[in-house]
């Protein structure tokens, strides 16, 4: 154990490149930006990190005193090692704002009683927990496109039967270089979900009701 701690402290602060491999082809490695841009590997697999970053106890304990944005930056920096510090901070700062989440805390923790706490993930613009991921994804994607020298417009196609469609629409709304089209079953979502989607604001969004089911 002591040897592991010495090794971790030795490498702390050094740039260790994280690569991603397909769940269907473990011989091919790509950068984080390339994995984000592609979404799926050519074989249809998912891109997963080649390893889980190791943290020492002091680093983990220090996270408790950080803001949500600071924690997000710290954790993302361990996985998206080809992003610069400025690029990551820009993505985090654009995604997690008080204007979007109604609070600087972003994801407040509510104490019910001794030993019982609730993590509130409904403060995002659509009141769905999926806002936590879909607010930052567009910025990570557009940054990845620039880093891999792609100039084409990104078109996002979404099929949804619930909260994902609205959270995706709100996340990509008016993000430069992107368009998003969401398809949903006409009789397969709640009235509130339908109204949320068909009244979505934004110059780059579109919604289509489909006769049929989600599958």
PLM segments and residue spans:
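PLP-dependent amino-acid enzyme catalytic core
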Residues: 6, 14-215
């Amino acid at each position: 154990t002591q040897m592991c701690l010495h090794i971790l402290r030795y490498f702390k602060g050094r740039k260790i490149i994280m690569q991603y491999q397909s769940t269907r082809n473990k011989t091919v490695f790509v950068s984080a930006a390339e994995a984000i841009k592609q979404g799926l590997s050519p074989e249809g697999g998912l891109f997963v990190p080649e390893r889980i970053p190791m943290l020492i106890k002091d680093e983990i304990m220090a996270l408790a005193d950080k803001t949500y944005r600071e924690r997000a930056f710290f954790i993302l920096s361990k996985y998206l090692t080809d992003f610069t510090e400025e690029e990551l901070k820009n993505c985090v700062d654009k995604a997690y704002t008080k204007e979007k989440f109604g609070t600087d805390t972003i994801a407040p923790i509510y104490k019910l009683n001794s030993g019982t706490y609730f993590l509130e993930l409904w403060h995002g613009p659509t009141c769905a927990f999926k806002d936590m991921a879909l607010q930052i994804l567009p910025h990570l994607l557009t940054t990845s496109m620039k880093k891999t020298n792609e100039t084409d417009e990104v078109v996002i196609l979404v099929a949804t039967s619930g909260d994902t469609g609205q959270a995706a629409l709100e996340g990509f709304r008016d993000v430069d270089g992107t368009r998003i089209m969401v398809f949903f079953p006409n009789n397969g979502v709640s009235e509130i979900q339908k109204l949320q989607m068909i009244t979505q604001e934004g110059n780059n969004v579109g919604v289509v009701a489909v006769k049929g089911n989600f599958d």
